[in-house]
C-alpha cells in the first residue's frame, strides 16, 4: 500500500486537536485506505484497540447504525472513559441526521473524530453551519504522478509511466490492473456509473439521465474552456435536447457535489476581484475521459492543464483562472493567503 505522506502528515498534525477531520473526495480515491493507514499508525504508537471505533456505512454489517440514535448509543457505550477515543466514520453522509451524532460526540473531551464522504452534502447548507469552526477539510485526490511512480516496477521509465498516467488515470486500484486495458475500462466505467447513478441521479432525483450524460460529455469535451451555463443550455437545445439554464445549473452543481468535476472561478488579477461569469471545470481524474467520451485521443494541452490543476489542488491554496488586464490567464494558478 502506498503511504500517502502529505495526507498522513495532515492527519498527524491535527491528531488529538479539537477539530473534526473531514476527508472528502471522489469515490475510490483512497479515503478508506487513508484512514486505515492512520488507524494502523495509531496502534503502532501505542493506542489500544479498545480506543478505536471504525464504522464503514457502506458495509451491510453496519446497516443498523444508519439510524442515528442506534449509532450514537453504540459509540457512546463503547467509549473508554479515561482515555482518548479515536472514531472513524466512513461515508457517514449515508446516516440520516448524522450531524446530530457528530455534534453530540464532539462535546466530549475524550474523542477525536475522523469522517469521510464522497459527496459535498457532507459539508452543505445547515450541516456546514452547524459544524462551522469545528472541522477541517482534507481534500483527497487520486494518486499524484509521484505516488503513481511508486506503484511502478523499478525499471519503468518516467516517460512510459507518464503516458500511462495520462491515459489510464490515477485511481489507486488502476496500477494493479494496468496490464489489462479492458479491465481498466470496465473498472472506470463501473466507477463512473456508480457516481452518476448513486451520487448524482439518486441524491438529486434527476429524471432525465440522458440529458445529464450529455452534459457530462460536453463538460469533458470542454475541459480547459470557460464554461457558461447558458452556452451549455443552448448547445443541448441545438442538439435536439431542449432544456433551461436553471436545469443545467442544477446538473453542474450535482456533478461538482459528487467530486467528479471541480469548479475553478475566474479572477481579475489586476482588479483584484472575482469575475461574475464563467468558470472552468476539471475532472477529478483524467482517466475518466476514456469512459465518458470514448478512446479518442488529442487535446493533450487541456489534459495537461487538468493535471496541473489537480497538482495545485493537492498542494492547497486558492486556485483561480481569469485575466490580468486584457490578457487571459488560461492555466490554473494558485494564490496563498
What are these regions (language model features)?
Residues 31:
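Conserved lysine of the Walker
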Residues 23:
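Hydrophobic anchor at the beta1->P-loop junction of P-loop NTPases
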Residues 181-336:
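Accessory nucleic acid-recognition modules appended to NTPase machines
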Amino acid at each position: 500500500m502506498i503511504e500517502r505522506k502529505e495526507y498522513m502528515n495532515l492527519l498527524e498534525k491535527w491528531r488529538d486537536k479539537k477539530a473534526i477531520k473531514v476527508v472528502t473526495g471522489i469515490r475510490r480515491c483512497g479515503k478508506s485506505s487513508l484512514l486505515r493507514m492512520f488507524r494502523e499508525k495509531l496502534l503502532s504508537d501505542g493506542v489500544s484497540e479498545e480506543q478505536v471505533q471504525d464504522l464503514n456505512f457502506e458495509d451491510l454489517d453496519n446497516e443498523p447504525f444508519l439510524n442515528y440514535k442506534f449509532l450514537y448509543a453504540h459509540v457512546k457505550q463503547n467509549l473508554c472513559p479515561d482515555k482518548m477515543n479515536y472514531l472513524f466514520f466512513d461515508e457517514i453522509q449515508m446516516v440520516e441526521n448524522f450531524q446530530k451524532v457528530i455534534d453530540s460526540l464532539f462535546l466530549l473531551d475524550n474523542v477525536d473524530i475522523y469522517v469521510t464522504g464522497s459527496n459535498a452534502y457532507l459539508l452543505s447548507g445547515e450541516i456546514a453551519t452547524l459544524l462551522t469552526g469545528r472541522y477541517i477539510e482534507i481534500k483527497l485526490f487520486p494518486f499524484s504522478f509521484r505516488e503513481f511512480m511508486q506503484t511502478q516496477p523499478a525499471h519503468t521509465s518516467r516517460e512510459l509511466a507518464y503516458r500511462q498516467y495520462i491515459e489510464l488515470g490515477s485511481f489507486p486500484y488502476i496500477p494493479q490492473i494496468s496490464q489489462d486495458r479492458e479491465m481498466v475500462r470496465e473498472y472506470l466505467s463501473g466507477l463512473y456509473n456508480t457516481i452518476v447513478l448513486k451520487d448524482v441521479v439518486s441524491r438529486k432525483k434527476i429524471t432525465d439521465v440522458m440529458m445529464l450524460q450529455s452534459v457530462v460529455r460536453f463538460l469533458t469535451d470542454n475541459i480547459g474552456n470557460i464554461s457558461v451555463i447558458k452556452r451549455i443550455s443552448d448547445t443541448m437545445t441545438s442538439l435536439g435536447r431542449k432544456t433551461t439554464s436553471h436545469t443545467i445549473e442544477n446538473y453542474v452543481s450535482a456533478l461538482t457535489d459528487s467530486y467528479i468535476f471541480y469548479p475553478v472561478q475566474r479572477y481579475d488579477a489586476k482588479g483584484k476581484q472575482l469575475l461574475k461569469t464563467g468558470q472552468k471545470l476539471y475532472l477529478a481524474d483524467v482517466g475518466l475521459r476514456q469512459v465518458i467520451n470514448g478512446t479518442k485521443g488529442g487535446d493533450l494541452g487541456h489534459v495537461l492543464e487538468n493535471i496541473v490543476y489537480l497538482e495545485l489542488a493537492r498542494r492547497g491554496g486558492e486556485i483561480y483562472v481569469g485575466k490580468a488586464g486584457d490578457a487571459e490567464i488560461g492555466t490554473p494558478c494558485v494564490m496563498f493567503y
